[in-house]
Amino acid sequence: MKRRYFGTDGIRGQSNVFPMTPDLAMRVGIAAGTIFRRGNHRHRVVIGKDTRLSGYMLENAMVAGFTAAGLDAFILGPIPTPAVAMLTRSLRCDIGVMISASHNPYEDNGIKLFGPDGYKLSDDIEAEIEDLLEKDLSTQLAKSDDIGRAKRVDGVHDRYIEHAKRTLPRDVTLQGLRIAIDCANGAAYKVAPAVLWELGADVVTIGNEPNGTNINLNCGSTSPVALQKKVDEVRADIGIALDGDADRVIIVDENGSIVDGDQLMAVIAESWAESQQLRGNGIVATVMSNLGLERFLDERGMALARTKVGDRYVVEHMRQHNYNVGGEQSGHIVLSDYGTTGDGLVAALQILAAVKRTGRTVSEVCRRFEPVPQLLRNVRISGGKPLEDIQVQKAIADAEAELAKTGRLVIRPSGTEPLIRVMAEGDDRAQIERIVNELIGTISNVRSAA
């Protein structure tokens, strides 16, 4: 069944445009509250957000919805997504909410939901919520004496700071490291610099002056140019770029070069394997991760399990098969020893631990493999199903046959935008570019004719 509201990472869209309206946010609160209002105990929801202007509006709407459904609401204010997941468990809540559109510009916003175990909701539970959203929710409202209360919770940032600090091995200190960190004017603008400073680093911070409209604006993990300049300017040993809700990270080495999530997973996998912390004798990544990562792991006797795109699917596979390292090329790194979802800061701390323990530079530590040439292009669509067209399917089959022994092809609809993503990788860059361009042309022609 096609889903109307939920994508690969919750509900997302332009603020004050369906589905990201206060009316729907309130209805999501009622619907989700109804589903998790089970048992005889007093029910609770924890609600966090990033720094977007629309966060105030959506926060109040969701508080109204959940309290109307009979849940007490704990309001956290701006805080990283992994902190919401952690606090959902530690505060014994029935459900957790993060209001954020992650790396998107401020005009967008989104709703991510976590179960009482701190994990993102399954497709089945999201389908239950969608089913309720199509019904009359007035029958689900709490009785007058059962309406929930709302309370703003103080001190939650300190809880997350202590949690993050505990993930750095006790024999490691960050003294002697100059770290430049870009907080994307987002949810981690207070906590991330504090963690690094308390662990002994010399910290230089940018992207820590949110005003409601500058989240991810020329800063953060999707726009690391400002961080590259700052690393060069202050001669930092490393740069750390988070995104708006701090669930992903990109590293800049001392030379200003960017290190993506694939390289970071390689570092952590190798380091944890050496210390016998790695479980599953490998890691979990998505179909978008570079073939070079797969070859790197294979050469060291480790496996790479692939899932469809979305960190929630990475986490599901990790839980099912007992892996403790997983992630995405984009910088979502999930370390299940320390959390239930991607955590950019905690992942960065594992890289810093490897740097300190080896005594090598960040560039030496983080360049674990040579990436295979990879090209990703998007085709914007306004409707229809071009991937079901016979002409497109034949072009895809021909491309897959050509790449069978030397590369990979991934074509998929975006889960968050009206796009079709075309990615190919292989040892021959010219071949990859030709294949992608031909497929883009075929899909575009079918789209235009539709």
UniProtKB/Swiss-Prot annotation:
PROSITE patterns: PGM_PMM. Mg(2+) binds at residues 102, 243, 245, 247. Transmembrane segments: none annotated. The modification Phosphoserine is found at residue 102. Gene3D superfamilies: Alpha-D-Glucose-1,6-Bisphosphate, subunit A, domain 3 (3.40.120.10), Alpha-D-phosphohexomutase, C-terminal domain (3.30.310.50). It comes from the Bacteria. Keywords: Isomerase, Magnesium, Metal-binding, Phosphoprotein. SUPFAM superfamilies: Phosphoglucomutase, C-terminal domain, Phosphoglucomutase, first 3 domains. It catalyses: alpha-D-glucosamine 1-phosphate = D-glucosamine 6-phosphate. Binds 1 Mg(2+) ion per subunit. It is an enzyme of class 5 (isomerase). Its cofactor is Mg(2+). CDD domains: GlmM. Coiled coil: none annotated. GO terms for molecular function: magnesium ion binding; phosphoglucosamine mutase activity; phosphomannomutase activity. GO terms for cellular component: cytosol. Belongs to the phosphohexose mutase family. Catalyzes the conversion of glucosamine-6-phosphate to glucosamine-1-phosphate. PANTHER family: PHOSPHOGLUCOMUTASE (ALPHA-D-GLUCOSE-1,6-BISPHOSPHATE-DEPENDENT), PHOSPHOHEXOSE MUTASE. This is Phosphoglucosamine mutase. It comes from Rhizobium etli (strain CIAT 652).
